């Protein structure tokens, strides 16, 4: 029995040593394979053409650049495109297959079936405050309304830029704007915004803090207001609380993968006058408004030219946002 026990122990020890040797051999082999694989990647990477999201390439040329209608262009096999449109467009077209028709037309421009998504919205104002932009490239169709031209330009500013906003309690606190990128954004069915600038003793400058009738009116009965006041000065603010909300917002920079197509209107809205829009660049496409089918056909024709002045899902804040008009 003693000899059998020793033999068993010896067998176990030999098995452990052999297993350890096999595992070390496998580990060394895998290390060798991984090393050769990484070395191969390092050698071929300079020759592989891939997108660079960190480089800022400014776009030069005429502000009224002419876009050529072309069927040739980049093959967007790995990109997605979202087209946002007002619900009225779908109602006017009244065709259950219209999205499939457009998908087939986008296919002729290099966009594979399934890469283009269509999403309607009921109210552009609500959409602009928190736009859900899901795709690599996002194109928003915005119908021009001559009764709210100012609102439209501010809506475009909200959609084309990233904003960080926080609620304001104007009944308890004074507020000041810290920089040109800091704005107060009011939205509602009826927004009348009044402000009273304060001195260092919190006394009103040209107004009485206890009398809102002496406040300066910066907006009256509007649906959307982006208020810009003198930086570094406290203000007491008054708004119609029952019909309006106000938030303290900071413009972080442009959404480079977003473009707006203005549908109709005599002129394209100019948002580049805002000193926080950097650089001062605008690309305009001018086509007469007819029917929604005509609008969508035009978008299909020029989609690749529009995409070329956008950045795919870029997070850089250096380049311009672009505003288009049909």
Curated annotation (Swiss-Prot):
Cite the residue spans of the region called GPR motif.
253-255
User: Per UniProt, where does Ca(2+) 2 bind?
Assistant: 177, 228-229, 301
Q: List the disulfide bonds.
A: 82-135, 165-249, 191-244, 196-207
The segment annotated CNP motif runs over: 165-167
Modification note: N-glycosylated. The N-terminus is blocked possibly by pyroglutamic acid.
Task: Please name the Gene3D superfamilies in this protein's record.
Answer: Glycoprotein VP7, domain 1, Rotavirus outer-layer protein VP7, domain 2
Q: Where in the cell is it found?
A: Virion; Host endoplasmic reticulum lumen
Matches recorded under InterPro entries = VP7 (IPR001963), VP7_1 (IPR042207), VP7_2 (IPR042210)
Report which residue ranges the record marks as coiled coil: none
Q: Which UniProt keywords apply?
A: Calcium, Capsid protein, Disulfide bond, Glycoprotein, Host endoplasmic reticulum, Host-virus interaction, Metal-binding, Outer capsid protein, Signal, T=13 icosahedral capsid protein, Virion
Record's GO cellular component, any one? viral outer capsid
Quote one Gene Ontology molecular function term: metal ion binding
Q: Does the keyword NAD apply?
A: no
Alphabetized Pfam families for the sequence: VP7
This molecule's function is given as: Calcium-binding protein that interacts with rotavirus cell receptors once the initial attachment by VP4 has been achieved. Rotavirus attachment and entry into the host cell probably involves multiple sequential contacts between the outer capsid proteins VP4 and VP7, and the cell receptors. Following entry into the host cell, low intracellular or intravesicular Ca(2+) concentration probably causes the calcium-stabilized VP7 trimers to dissociate from the virion. This step is probably necessary for the membrane-disrupting entry step and the release of VP4, which is locked onto the virion by VP7.
Other information: Some rotavirus strains are neuraminidase-sensitive and require sialic acid to attach to the cell surface. Some rotavirus strains are integrin-dependent. Some rotavirus strains depend on ganglioside for their entry into the host cell. Hsp70 also seems to be involved in the entry of some strains.
- Descriptive protein name: Outer capsid glycoprotein VP7
